[in-house]
Amino acid sequence: MRRISDLPNVVAMKVTGGSSIALTIQAFQLCGDRILVSDPMPDRWFFTIPKYGQQWAGAGPFYCMQTPENPRIVRIFDNLIKGEIDKAMDIFWEMSRPGPQGSLADSYFHTGIVTALTDKYAHWCAGGNGGTVRQPTGRLYDYQKDGIRAGMKALGITPREPEEEFYVGRVNYAKGYRLKKYEA
């Protein structure tokens, strides 16, 4: 891992969300003095920011936990940067009360199949474009969508409607695109 930071065009490294904490710590210890290292998982920031000086979050499903009116994740990160851990913790627990959303709502990691479709759905519910992911992908079940929508509502986020908009994408839906009706 240290050799990555020797490459002249490498300035940062994102430790994939959901990986082991040991990998996160090792990445900061081996590369953190030479390149910017990021773990995108908010619960890890409580030690990666104060101990290792993490400066950025990398990509993650933050959109399903905040809105422009209430940027919870941004506030957590900013408070941790300022050393205001108690304030960050209050926001974290407020956000965690309803239970996890997106991919964490029904952890597909246990299935051995990793798909971003639940995260895409949660993003769409919070105002994102939606649209499905490339094939092959897993199916998004009604109970998963119901759980994501319930979590959104508990956070004070009104999920988007109609469902069809998710599948074609918000932008395409606004242009008049609709799902094709397939007959058996």
What feature does the model see in each segment?
Residues M1-T111:
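Catalytic alpha/beta core domains of metabolic enzymes, predominantly
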Residues G60-A184:
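C-terminal alpha-helical cap/extension of soluble enzyme domains
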